[in-house]
Amino acid sequence: MRAVVDAKEFSQALDKVSRALRKSACIPVLEEALVRFTGGRCILTGTDFETWLMTEIPAQGDDFAFVFHRTADAAKACRRFDGELHLELAESGEGRNKELRLLMRCGHRAGELHAFLPEEYPEPPTLEPKHSFTVNAASLLERINRIKYATVKPTEKTNACCTSIHFSGNRIYCLDGLRAAWDTDESWAAPIPFMTPAAPLAHLKLFGNKDVSVLLDKRYVSITDGTLNLLFRRVEAVPFDLDSAIPRQFREEVCVQPKEFMAELAYLKELAPSNQKYVIRFCNGRITTQVDECRYETEIHLDGKSEIEIGFNLCHMMDALQQFKGESHVRMKLTSPISPILLEAEDRSDHALVLPVRLKRMPAAA
């Protein structure tokens, strides 16, 4: 069984699907990529059992399939190939004793590799999409990257709402119970509210600046440009009602400089003991914290005046300000000491929300 492909195209395709593979898996085949030649196409697949990456390139020759053994090493070798890549698959033995051996030849270079049987590879789920929409992959990824900090890593005990990217109408958002971040795009809207894990969406960068079709099945999401297909499981839960967490009215509004604010928070973080939770007391530009009965202070310039004293987690506020890195000013909207703190910037479609921390009475400075 023989087939011929363009070496560069094959190498690039193998690199793409390898991003879905597990580096160390209890099931060895999940560390490897499936290659299938059929109908003049070479289809490559990589999966970790949760996410599938599949792509195809033109091919000539017979129809056959195999699973790479030591995919990572094969991918390194393929990057050195140029021109026509010839792949030959030989079988030996029968039944449980059946073995595959793969020969790759390109120019004066050749290599013989063991291969797994394709029957050992997990089949991707069959989708019956009920809804679909089109979006630019690069634009969507940029929006996700701005807000994904407001998620937590998934564990068995973590609420799915806190680990996921939420899609609802023309908004995407994240929240972890202590903060939230969202972005609005009036040019498109999700046909139904849904949630996805954050990790698979990092693969959107493989599509570059292309428009992609997003297909929504009851349990899965498929994102494709017609050649590359990203398939992963949906989070089977109802997205959180973000509007219920956003204050509708604000008593005060001040402008801060993100760079200056982050620098002063970084100063306090470096000065205070590192094994403590950093609870910051903020009022009219004055920033104070107290750790182990020691008091630390600094201040920033405000455009506007604030009389509401609020408390917040230092790291959460730094993450929210980082969302607006590069902006000269950010508006901070306040309602009360116990209401969420809203951050936004002029001509930006994204927002951040930080939940306050209840403040204890602080002794007067010596």
Locations of regions flagged by a protein language model:
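Structural preference for solvent-exposed beta-strand-turn elements
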Residues: 1-366
